[in-house]
Design a protein with these regions (language model features):
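Alpha-helical protein-protein interaction modules
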Residues: 5-8, 13-161
Length: 161
């Protein structure tokens, strides 16, 4: 069920993704992989408050996650959820705990800084991102996200540019 949630989320069939995600969560609400998958779906479908709570729960259940060598992925997920729900300070708090940020975690941090009118810090982070990922364009990374409401994606892209 968790995998069907992920697959349907990728193809933007949010109704089916939620069906399988909720089913998986109801069957095993303490499996961090299930909690994370369902939490990500909720963040992408305009229920960021609940989704971020689940992402934090997944981090607390298993900070490192199966196959990972550190907690950076889970922390990045929480940063992203915090940004989407509008808790920019929480995003920055979790940023202090992360080691190497993935592009979406960078986008969440940079968009949060812009939302908090911290332009100098935003510019500094944009330069750090470009140095860390010289071949990536942040807007293109945001385009890879599967938001149900595309205005959320566009707002994020506008804030990081």
């Amino acid at each position: 069920n968790r995998l069907l949630c992920e697959i349907n989320k990728f193809f933007e069939d949010f109704e089916q993704s939620e069906f399988y995600g909720k089913k998986a969560y109801d069957m095993n609400s303490n499996d961090p992989r299930v909690v994370c998958a369902y939490g990500e779906l909720l963040v992408l479908t305009n229920r960021a408050e609940e989704g971020t709570d689940l992402l934090i729960k997944a981090y607390e259940l298993d900070p490192v996650g199966m196959g990972a060598s550190n907690a950076d992925k889970r922390l990045g997920d929480v940063m992203f959820g915090s940004y989407v729900k509008g808790d920019y300070q929480q995003c920055l708090v979790y940023d202090k705990k992360i080691g190497r940020k993935q592009p979406i975690a960078w986008a969440a941090k940079i968009a949060s800084l812009e939302s908090l009118n911290q332009s100098q810090e935003k510019e500094s982070e944009l330069k750090k991102f470009a140095g860390t990922y010289p071949d990536l364009v942040l807007g293109e990374e945001i385009d890879k996200l599967h938001f149900q409401d595309t205005t959320v994606k566009q707002t994020m892209k506008d804030l990081v540019s």
